[in-house]
Amino acid sequence: MHEQLSPRDQELEARLVELETRLSFQEQALTELSEALADARLTGARNAELIRHLLEDLGKVRSTLFADAADEPPPPHY
């Protein structure tokens, strides 16, 4: 036999369904945010590595372009 729910029980049932629905959406949002954070961390790590390499390359270029003046031969008028 199937009993009819009282109005109070129906209200509680509706509230429970609403809360379960909200929880489901929040869990989905949390999963998406977690994935986005993981992607951002990977991107940040890659960018940090790229910057490190670029700074090394820049240092090499600077040392080539702006060599120590003591290493340069004197100008011809000396």
Curated annotation (Swiss-Prot):
Coiled-coil regions listed in the entry: none
Gene3D superfamilies: 1.20.5.300
A Pfam match: SlyX
Transmembrane segments: none
Organism superkingdom: Bacteria
Family classification: Belongs to the SlyX family.
NCBIfam families (UniProt xref): PRK00846.1
Protein's recorded name: Protein SlyX homolog
Organism, as annotated: Xanthomonas campestris pv. campestris (strain ATCC 33913 / DSM 3586 / NCPPB 528 / LMG 568 / P 25)
Top-level taxonomy: Bacteria, Pseudomonadati, Pseudomonadota, Gammaproteobacteria, Lysobacterales
